[in-house]
Amino acid sequence: MRLIFSLLLLVGCTVQAAEPVQSFTDDLGRVVNVPLHPQRIVSLHDLDITIPLIELGVPPVASHGRTRPDGSHFLRSGVLLTGVDFDNSNMTYIGTADIDIEAIVAAKPDLIITEPSRNTPIEQLEKIAPTGQHRSS
């Protein structure tokens, strides 16, 4: 949660041409340089990252989610806690267990927030956008 709040402090209302960056240490002790005002956040965990971002007024442009038996996608507890889900927002579904790297690239993120249980190597995510890891408590 500390990472999410730290990143939210960096989120601003405007984007400048040459976006300044700020360094912080993520929950795994890595120093990460992130945009001072990220506008296009991708979340790699629905309940631990996406829901808190939505609750704080910073919905991600794309998120990990779950799949129903009928094949439709949803945010775990999303409707219950926030009223937000993939079918009533502009948020893009990027996968469940296996994350769709092409969908992340297509979302054009300026910040990716992941957590240690994701199968996607952080080195691969860092080639797309600055990536911070959040360890859920």
Annotate the PLM regions:
Residues 3-5, 13-51:
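Bacterial Sec-exported substrate-binding components of ABC uptake systems
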Residues 47-101:
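A short, structured surface patch at a secondary-structure boundary
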Residues 44-45, 114-116:
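Short His-Asn-centered micro-motif
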